[in-house]
Every structure is written in C-alpha cells, then in structure tokens.
Design a protein with these regions (language model features):
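Transmembrane helical core of 7TM receptor-like proteins
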Residues: 1-286
Length: 286
C-alpha cells in the first residue's frame, strides 16, 4: 500500500510542473510510469490487501475481466516506460552527445506516436482478459488445464492455440524489454566506470552532477525492474509449462510483480529534487 501515496506524490509534482511548463522529457516518462504503477497497485495490490485482512472481495465475470484487463495493460506500460526511460537516459549521458543529438530529437518528436502505438498494442494483446476471465468461485481454476491463475480471478482459455499463443506474445514482449533493460544497464555502468576513470586522471573534467544523479536513479529503476519483472517472467513461463497450475507459483508471481510498482516510487522521490521540493512546499503550507 506504500506505493499509492508515493505514486500520487509523483503524479501531483509532475502535473504541477507540466502546468507551469517546467518539465523535461524524462519527467514526462516518469509521470506516466507513476500512473501505470498506480493502476497496477489499485487493481492488484488493493484486492490482495483486503483479502489479507479477511475482507472478501466479490467478483463476477465482468469485474474480473475489467480488473485484469486494466492490470495487464498497466503492467505492460510500466515495463515499456521503464525501458524507454533507460534508453533515453543512455542518450542523454552519451560521451559524444553530438552524434546522438539527431537520434535524441527524433525520439522526442516521435514520443507521442510511440506511446499511442504501445498503448494500442497492449490494449489489443490483453483483450483476452476481458473475454475469458472468471472468479475463482465460478470454477476450480487449479484443476483447469488451460488456465492462468491470479489471486482473485483466473483466465480460462478455450483452446491450446489461444493459450500458448497469448502466453508466447506476453513472454516475448517481456523478454524483449528485459534484454533492452540489460543493454541499457550495461551501458550506464560502462559510462559510470569511464567517468570515474576520467575523474581520477583529470579532476577538472566532470559531467554535470544532475546528469549523474539522474542516471544513477534510472540505473536503480532498471536493476529493480530486472529483479522483479525478470523473476515474474520466469514464473510466468513455468505457469505455461506446468499443469495443473500451482497456487504457489501464482503467489510468487504476485509478490515479485507488486514489488516494482510499490517500491520504485520511493526511489524516484529520494533521487528527484523537484519532487522533494514539491513535497516540502506542500508540507510547509500545511
């Protein structure tokens, strides 16, 4: 539940910055990332928390479908936005910015189109959650063969082709962004090492402190992403290959899947001075 106030604080800070025309492309991506993480927590974390405290959440087929649909789309956008943030940060701290300037401007110009395209892609891919979701009370999900089990609902596919086809698309998409994150992380580590060596040899030569701080923040997000979503994807592939479905795998997926959306806002707040200043200002007014 700590992710809700954290993501709301990020959204409020960046919404204010956008209204004041005082924002950067990285902050736009961070704001959208906070929105995606907030939707993940509201559709996955809140029901689980209520269930842990003994509050029964009554779901029917419609509410299961809508909840899982919003969750899956938001989770996919969270992955995409994190990878985009890493790639954009690599362009910003490139040792030869003149060579990357044209690519950077091209990405900035196409950023809205890229966002819309990814939204449409994920809305289409995740539509199976709308059509085939049902509550646990409607069927014994653990005994069904072609089933993806969530904590309060499940998705029962009508055919092997749709089951494995949809799973393959999900795994391929997640693995693509995992590879992209790994490459971005490796490049950022390489730049940090090169910068450290240059600082030892030429103390007067240094990169802007704000760029280093922002890059380290993104590096932390990438590492958190690789840990949480990487393990989640592993459990997802096990879920596809194991029948009947084990609830332990579903619980493990839930835990690793929720870590990133809940903890990443704390890292963003601790490393972003604009958000810290906004929070101090709000507390001072009170």
């Amino acid at each position: 539940m700590i992710g809700i106030p954290g993501n709301l604080a990020i959204l409020c800070a960046f919404t204010k910055a956008i209204c004041q025309q005082n924002f950067t492309p990285s902050e736009i991506i961070l704001g959208k990332l906070a929105l995606a993480n907030l939707l993940v927590i509201l559709t996955r974390g809140v029901p689980l928390t209520l269930q842990a405290f003994g509050v029964r959440t009554m779901y029917d087929g419609l509410t299961c479908g809508i909840t899982l649909y919003i969750y899956c789309v938001s989770r996919a956008m969270s992955i995409f936005l994190t990878s985009m943030l890493g790639c954009f940060q690599c362009l910003l701290i490139a040792p030869c910015p003149s060579r990357c300037l044209r690519l950077r401007h091209s990405i900035l110009e196409k950023l809205p189109s890229i966002m819309i395209s990814l939204w449409c892609f994920n809305l289409l891919v995740c539509c199976t959650r709308l059509f085939y979701s049902m509550p646990h009370t409607g069927t014994n999900c653990t005994e069904e063969e072609l089933t993806v089990v969530y904590d309060f609902c499940c998705v029962v596919f009508p055919s092997h082709l749709l089951y494995f086809g949809n799973g393959a698309v999900f795994v391929t998409r997640d693995m693509f962004f995992l590879v992209l994150m790994t490459v971005s992380s490796g490049y950022l580590l390489f730049v940090f090492r090169q910068h450290g060596n240059l600082m030892k040899r030429l103390p007067m030569l240094q990169m802007k402190h704000s760029e280093i701080r922002a890059a380290k923040s993104v590096m932390g997000l990438l590492a958190m992403y690789l840990l949480s979503f990487g393990l989640d994807s592993v459990f997802w592939m096990v879920n596809l290959c194991v029948s009947p479905v084990s609830l332990r795998f579903a619980d493990a997926r839930m835990f690793f899947d929720s870590c990133y959306s809940a903890i990443s806002p704390m890292l963003i707040i601790l490393t972003n001075r604009k958000i810290q200043a906004g929070l101090k200002c709000a507390i001072g007014k009170r």
